[in-house]
């Protein structure tokens, strides 16, 4: 009879442990879902900010291009305009990253693809912002 009690108590302990493990797994999966939703929201906000920044840069570059389009330019200004045109092409390529890098992303999972695009945006936007600020600074000095 003692053996039956030992088996019954062991079974109760094992089932309680299994339930606690299952509850832990559920709470972890719920935390993962919440973290993933938070990351999506952050990426969405970051995407909107980048989109606004790209639009502003495009507008500034187009305005500069139209300002200096009809007057005689020096060689230095011509070089600045070429750089601005290259910046515009880079910004346009950011609008359609799937087409631009379709071959690179085959075989990657979704996280790797998201990280790849984020790295590409940082790699392109950093020099682009520097180039635009240098070009604007140089043009403002010449005007003033």
From Swiss-Prot:
The modification Isoleucine amide is found at residue 143. One of its GO terms (biological process) is defense response to bacterium. Residues 19-43, 74-123 form a propeptide. Maximin-3 shows antibacterial activity against both Gram-positive and Gram-negative bacteria. It also shows antimicrobial activity against the fungus C.albicans, but not against A.flavus nor P.uticale. It has little hemolytic activity. It possess a significant cytotoxicity against tumor cell lines. It possess a significant anti-HIV activity. It shows high spermicidal activity. InterPro entries: Bombinin (IPR007962). Expressed by the skin glands. It comes from Bombina maxima. This is Maximins 3/H9 type 2. Residues 1-18 form the signal peptide. Belongs to the bombinin family. Keywords: Amidation, Amphibian defense peptide, Antibiotic, Antimicrobial, Cleavage on pair of basic residues, Cytolysis, Fungicide, Hemolysis, Secreted, Signal. GO terms for cellular component: extracellular region. It holds the Pfam family Bombinin. Coiled coil: none annotated. It is found in: Secreted.
